[in-house]
Amino acid sequence: MEDNIPKFDIPLDFIVGDSITGEILNQYGRFPCKIKAGVFVLCVQGSVQATVNLTKFIIKPNDFITLPPGCFIQIHEVSDDVKLCFAGFSSTFVSHINYIKTITNYLPVIFDSPVMPLPVPVSQLYQEAFSLLIKAYSLPKTIENKEIIKAIFTIFMQGVIELYKNHTPYSNAPMTRNMEICRE
C-alpha cells in the first residue's frame, strides 16, 4: 500500500528558496504525498490549506512548518498571493546524520503539530535567515561542502527545538499515547 503513495524527495543535498508558487503547490493537491526529505517552511504571505499527518491545517503568515522524513502531506487549497520560504535536505543527506538523537523528545510533538505560529519578531528573524541562506545558495560552489550543509541542518533542527520549547504549550504537557509510541 505504501508503495502506491507518491514520495517527495529532493535531488540535491540541500535547497533553499522563496519561489514556490500556488501553481506548484496545487500539483501536490491531487493526492497525499510521503515526505522523504527534511523540509522547513515559513509562510510569509497568503494561506495554504493542507493535511499533514492526517490533521488539517490552515497555514497563514508567520507559521513555521517542520516536515521531517516520514510525514505525509496533501495540499488542498492555496491562495494566489502565497509566499513561502523553504529549506530542504534530501533523504540521502538526512539519512547520514543522526538527527533523531537530537530531537527525540520533540519528534512526537513535531509529528503531532508540524505547524507552529510564530510571534512577528521571531518570524522576521527567520525571514532574514532564509534571505541570507538564499543569497549564499546563489553563489557558485558555496553550498557544496557537506559539513556546511550539516551545520545548516543542525541550526534548523536546534532552532525547531527552541521554537517548540519557547512558543508552544507542549514543553511541559503530558505525552499522548501517540506521542509515546512515536518516541519509542
Sequence positions of predicted segments:
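A short, Lys/Arg-enriched amphipathic alpha-helix from helix-turn-helix/homeodomain DNA-binding modules
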Residues: 171-184
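Conserved metal-binding segment of the jelly-roll/cupin
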Residues: 59-72, 88
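Short beta-strand His + acidic residue motifs that chelate non-heme Fe in jelly-roll/DSBH
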Residues: 49-51, 67, 73-79
